[in-house]
């Protein structure tokens, strides 16, 4: 089922709000040590809207619900010993990446690619077992009762999103820090403008009425028939965990300026633009491609 978007009817206030949210996310993000503060300066959505189709509607995945329960439990433990309550996190990772003693925003590091791949394969095998009562899409009686009592419905939608645009503009600024013996000896200002892109993704949007939040994640898109769990199995699980950022965002057009405008400026530096594109694709894999996801609280 296709969704018609009045893309050109979106007001500037929507783009400004999106800009603020992106800057809030960037402020909380762990950036590479060689990059200075990064900020989105402006967003223009352009005249070419994405093609969006609903391909699946079902129950909220158990992984999402368990992550919310675990985050709530960790937050309660923190509140019991804190004088002021912590700010509700903008982002959550999957349940299995938490430690019982961590706060909701704590994420384990150091896991190698093989362990991540094995976890993903195990998760994919659970999704394919549609006859199992303990599969990802199961609904416990307690969950069903809580859902009925909530004034917000609980459901999960999978959307096929294809966005080919050359009219959008996203301007951001950052700096390249050059260090010697752990001391920054030089900082080069960098201005970047995204002038076009091709995005092919399956957006996973889960509305959780019990915990009053929305889970957002991405997966690869495909023309293959949708599986009962909502994901389109287009690749072997061992391949699916690698280079997804490149397949989701195969094309990204950038314009760059390196240096201070009052002094010498280098424009359209190819190596910088390729590096930024690779870093953005890696960010997609590390932050948004399932099993990673964002949680927005209502």
Swiss-Prot record:
Superkingdom of source: Eukaryota
Compartment(s) of residence: Mitochondrion outer membrane; Endoplasmic reticulum membrane
Keyword Mitochondrion: yes
Record has DNA-binding as a keyword: no
Polar residues bias (residue ranges): 133-142
Domain notes per entry: The SMP-LTD domain is a barrel-like domain that can bind various types of glycerophospholipids in its interior and mediate their transfer between two adjacent bilayers.
Family affiliation: Belongs to the MDM12 family.
This protein's name: Mitochondrial distribution and morphology protein 12
The organism of origin for this protein: Malassezia globosa (strain ATCC MYA-4612 / CBS 7966)
């Amino acid at each position: 089922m296709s969704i018609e978007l009045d893309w050109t009817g979106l007001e500037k206030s929507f783009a400004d709000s999106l800009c603020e949210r992106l800057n809030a996310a960037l402020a909380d993000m762990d950036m590479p040590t060689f990059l200075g503060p990064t900020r989105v300066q402006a967003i223009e959505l352009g005249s070419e809207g994405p093609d969006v189709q609903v391909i699946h509607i079902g129950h909220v995945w158990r992984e999402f619900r368990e992550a919310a329960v675990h985050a709530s439990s960790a937050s309660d433990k923190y509140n019991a010993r804190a004088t002021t309550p912590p700010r509700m996190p903008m982002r959550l990772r999957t349940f299995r990446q938490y430690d019982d003693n961590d706060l909701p925003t704590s994420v384990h590091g150091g896991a190698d690619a093989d362990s991540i791949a094995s976890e993903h394969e195990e998760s994919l095998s659970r999704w394919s077992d549609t006859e199992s009562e303990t599969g990802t899409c199961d609904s416990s009686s307690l969950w069903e009762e809580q859902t009925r009592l909530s004034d917000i419905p609980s459901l999960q939608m999978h959307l096929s999103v294809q966005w080919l645009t050359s009219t959008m503009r996203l301007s951001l600024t950052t700096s390249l820090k050059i260090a010697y013996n752990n001391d920054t000896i030089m900082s080069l200002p960098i201005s970047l403008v995204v002038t076009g892109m091709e995005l092919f993704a399956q957006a996973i949007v889960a509305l959780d009425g019990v915990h009053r939040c929305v889970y957002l994640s991405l997966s690869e898109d495909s023309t293959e028939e949708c599986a009962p769990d909502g994901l389109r199995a287009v690749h072997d699980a061992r391949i699916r965990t690698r280079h997804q950022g490149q397949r989701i965002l195969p094309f990204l057009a950038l314009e760059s300026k390196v240096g201070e405008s009052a002094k010498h400026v280098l424009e359209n530096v190819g190596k910088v633009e390729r590096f930024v594109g690779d870093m953005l694709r890696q960010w997609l894999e590390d932050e948004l491609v399932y099993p990673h996801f964002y949680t927005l609280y209502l």
